Amino acid sequence: MGLEVHILGTSSARPTNIRQVSGSLISCDEGIAVVDAGEGFQSRFSNQRKRMKTYESYHLKSSRVAVLCLTHGHLDHTWGVLPWLQSMALDNRNQPLLIIGPTSSEVVESLLENTTLPEDTPHSDLSQQFQFWHKLGGTSENLGYQVRWVLGDVSGDRWVEFDTTTGKVIQLPKQPQPQGWRNNRIDALATVHGIPSCAWKLSTKEKPGKFDRKRAIELGLNDEQRAQLAAG
């Protein structure tokens, strides 16, 4: 399959009569990436699953969600995260989930040094929200399934992970990918906003073209050259 994009919300700041706040799904052959989860996200996800099942005979299973990509910490993009995580726990989810988003280089340094966050850190910075959600039960231990909490200084390509068991923050060698993904990947792209933010790109590996054996013979290619072409 290719990539399927399901836009579940595009409204800014608050819902309107015809639009809901941010939340989208990108489905690929290896799973689903969720981009932002504003207020009421799980209800919109549920409604979209019903629509797809009824009209397209297609199952948009929440168990296939492998990663939640957050673009920034404003609540119209994040307020639905914790309720949704709790609901998946009630559904006995056992698949791992990666939650990843942007922060500032100063916050990354503070987290690694285990010092108080800089005074000018916005209240809506994801570092503050992550720690708040952990206190409210958003950990692997409380939810019953593995959740990785990762923040990054996108421009500097520095990534850290919260170890909710020990309370420590660990620096990662590179931006992590959803577990088990081999043919698809996510990448953060720096953007400009009032707080640390990023866009997310989901890309898929190109499949090799069909090997034209007849044309290879006409060109007089040897066995080694043919094997290389056939392998893509």
List where the protein language model places each region.
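Binuclear metal-dependent hydrolase catalytic cores
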Residues: M1-G232
